Amino acid sequence: QADIFIRGGSFDQTMVLLNGIDFTDARTGHQSHSLPVDIDCISAVDLLDGVPGVGAFAGAVNIRTAPLKPTYLRFEGAGGQHGYAYANLSGAVTSGRFSLLAAGSYRRSDGYRHNTEFANYNAFVRATYEAPRAGFFDLQAGYQNRAFGSNGFYAAYNPEQCEHTLTALASLRWLQSVGRF
């Protein structure tokens, strides 16, 4: 878990965008960075200057996703001490004007001390289509399930603290040029 601070502003003053769509958590910016996208699906991270909208007093971060290659299928796995395990399945298909990127992952650990365990599930899909006359369509959807112990994070006298967050997001964007504009 981490917070984003830009130019002295807090996480509540920083907008988080995924492929240009605002997914800032309206309840608390503390969870805004918890997007259901694995690092190998990220093609770039842009730091946007100025104030692109409400909730972006300090600035904005745009996370862009793109396939690693036009067409691929990839499985990745890892393991380590304290019961650490990681598995990721991702792939993409690109054909002409259509592109599909999909990924799912699981990451867990028993923790390095009492009540520092975690289990994270991510699923993300993005499909784009450039229609000759109808315009550009961009659909993305994701789901995340995170549970983790936070031993002493909120109060040192209570080591039995934990958090569990569920995130579901989706967007459909349509871009169409009109006339010569």
Regions flagged by a language model, labelled:
Residues 21-49, 64:
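Short acidic/polar hinge/loop motifs at secondary-structure boundaries
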Residues 15, 44-48, 60-66, 72-81, ...:
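Predominantly transmembrane beta-strands of Gram-negative outer membrane beta-barrel pores used
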Residues 1, 32, 58, 84-86, ...:
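Transmembrane beta-barrel architecture of outer-membrane proteins
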